[in-house]
Each structure stands twice: as structure tokens, then as C-alpha cells.
Amino acid sequence: MRAISPRMIRGEFRGRLGGFALDASFSVPATGITGLFGPSGCGKSTVLRCLAGLQHLPGSLCDVDGDVWQDDSTFLKPHQRPIGYVFQEASLFQHLSVKANLVYGAPRGDAGGAAGVIAFDEVIELLGLARLLDRAPRNLSGGERQRVAIGRALLSQPKLLLMDEPLSALDRLTKDEILPFLERLHARLSLPVIYVSHDITEIERLADHLILMRAGHVIGVGPLSDLQSDPALPLATARDAAVNFAAIAEAYDANYGLLTLRVDGGRLLVPSGPVEPGARRRIRIAAGDVSLAREAPRATSILNALSARIVSTSPVGPNEMLVVLGLGPNGNGARLLARVTRRSWDQLQLAEGIEVFAQVKGVALASERGVSEATK
């Protein structure tokens, strides 16, 4: 068997499925949420089925946290793999109550608070299911059914949770209701999750790492922010390009309702309610909300102007330049994207390697309660 370093999930899946050729290799941390993203039909769900053992491609490899589920001499069947699987449509037992659905398939016996065990009461709290326990599935909304399906998967005590576009069958309002619950799961549980979606807003809200696919191939693997800011990949050149990264709350100004966030390479002021110092927050800054200046701006309504250095540039269409910025005077901090016109580029005499000020006109602050837009 081929051993790899622990705390990683490694997949090498190759083969033909009818007219579709899959050649997908990746290695991601066995912690947090890894997004599996790409256009419809690129092979995302097929990779998930390979991880689950529902699809057998001979000669492939599947290693989860040091346990080999598939290699040249091994193939564990789906029931032998400690996985939880959440599908696009919640498949609940209609003749059972919500509570009975939740405990169906859970390991028998009392775990007694054993390390790593996900407790029933914890799942009920995290997913907001207490008032639903005695209901029948037919009396639940689409979002409630999906929350029950997620809870049932968690209570099976999986080593890996697979989620195949779990929000795709829901309308936007229902998606917005469920996303905060998924964020809470992410914050409270150490269980690794592979999350399939073709909706970039879900990936930006939830994922720590990303597997980017196109036409059956993996074209990028790594931390979400790294792939978002790589001009060689499609996320950076998209019209709605943005970068997500972690921030730490430092102070709150109750007089102005402004939260000071420390990021790698600078500080940001964001309109917000009170937040405890040290709390971690996730922020999103769109390329279209970043403008550049050669000197520190004065007398402006824009709250945030960060020292940065131009790391790289590339043309986007005939009129614009995509600029990758590194925060901090040396450019060693977090990466940002900016889109500037070619005219502005020439007039400001911008070039790779020079120091600039990145004026951030808008910051999306994600929290357990959702996303609030902070502008100017």
C-alpha cells in the first residue's frame, strides 16, 4: 500500500465513464471544508462518488487521513467507508419522525462522550432542530428537510463528510437560511468536509481549501485565497472575482459602529455590531471594489487605504488590467485583486514591484449570522 502523511485526503481517480474521461488528482488537508468547484458536467460529483466507493475506477487511489480506502490491492465498499453523504435532495424516511430519522444509522451503544464523537444534542443545537424532532418529514420545508439530512449524516459518526450540491435544489432565500448553519458546523466541528458546488458564493462562504475542476481534470488545488488570486486560473479573471481571507477582531468603536480587523499585512475598518477582541472573522473583498493610488489618499470617504505592493499584472480584455497585490510595504501579506483601466495604469505609471495604496471601497464580512456589506 502507498502511505502518505497523516491528516491529508488524497485522491487519484482516472478512467473513462462512457464518453467522459476523468483524470483527477489532489491532496488536501483532512480538516475544515474543501470546496470542489467547477462548471456543471466537469466531474465534481463523479469524484465524490469515487471517494464514497460508489464508483470503482481500477488503478485509482483514495487515502483519507492515513487510511487507504482504495489502491492497487484494496477497494473498500461504500458501507466499509466511514463517510456521511448528503445529496442534492434530502432522502428521509417518510414514516419516521425527524428524531427517528436522525438516529437511523447512528452507531449502536452509548459513546459516553468519547473523543471525536458528535453528540446528538450538539447536532440538534448546531442545526436548530429542537422544535422539529416530533414532526413528520412531509410537514417540513425544503430547507428543514436538508438540515435533518445533514444531521443524520453527522450522527453516523463519519470520518469524512461528503456534500454533493446540498443547496442546489433550494431557492435563494432558503439557501441564505441554511448557510449560517453550515458556517456554525464549520466553526464548531473538526470533521473534514468535501463540499461540491457550482455556486461560487457558497464556496466563498464556506471553503478553506479548493479543488478546481474543468472537463474532468483538476486545474488547481490549494487554499481558497491562493486560487482566487492566481491570474492563471479562471476565478481571478472572472468579472465577479474576489478574494476571501481570515481576519482577527482587534477593537470595536461603539461611537461609530466600526470594527477594526487585523489581516495579514494591514488593518481594516468595517461597519459592524460589537465583536469580542480576538474573534476570527472571514472577509471577502471584490476586485471591483479595490482602486489604486500612488500616494496615501486624503480627504476621502473611503475608510480603508492599505499599503501594498504590485505582485503581478495581466491584461483582461482590451481595456483593463488585472492587478495582484500583496498587502504590507513589502508585499508579503494577504493577496488582493484589483481591476484598473489601461488608461489609469499608464497615467499612474504603475508597474510590477512598486508600492501603492489599495483603496478598499467595500468589504463583505461573513459571520455565523450571515454576510453584511460594509461600504465606504
Swiss-Prot record:
EC number: 7.3.2.5
Enzyme class name: translocase
GO cellular component assignments: plasma membrane
Catalysed reaction equations from the record: molybdate(out) + ATP + H2O = molybdate(in) + ADP + phosphate + H(+)
Pfam families: ABC_tran, TOBE
UniProt cross-references to InterPro entries, sorted A to Z: AAA+_ATPase, ABC_transporter-like_ATP-bd, ABC_transporter-like_CS, Mo/tungstate-bd_C_term_dom, ModC_ABC_ATP-bd, Molybdenum_import_ModC, Mop_domain, P-loop_NTPase
Keywords annotated in UniProt: ATP-binding, Cell inner membrane, Cell membrane, Membrane, Molybdenum, Nucleotide-binding, Translocase, Transport
Membrane topology classification: Peripheral membrane protein
Domain Mop: start-end pairs: 299-369
Annotated binding of ATP, by residue: G38, P39, S40, G41, C42, G43, K44, S45
Domain ABC transporter: 1-240
Stored PROSITE patterns: ABC_TRANSPORTER_1, ABC_TRANSPORTER_2, MODC, MOP
Localization annotation: Cell inner membrane
Record-level Gene Ontology MF annotations: ABC-type molybdate transporter activity; ATP binding; ATP hydrolysis activity
Family designation: Belongs to the ABC transporter superfamily. Molybdate importer (TC 3.A.1.8) family.
Family matches, as NCBIfam families: modC_ABC
Function: Part of the ABC transporter complex ModABC involved in molybdenum import. Responsible for energy coupling to the transport system.
Summary of subunit composition and partner proteins: The complex is composed of two ATP-binding proteins (ModC), two transmembrane proteins (ModB) and a solute-binding protein (ModA).
Protein known as: Molybdenum import ATP-binding protein ModC
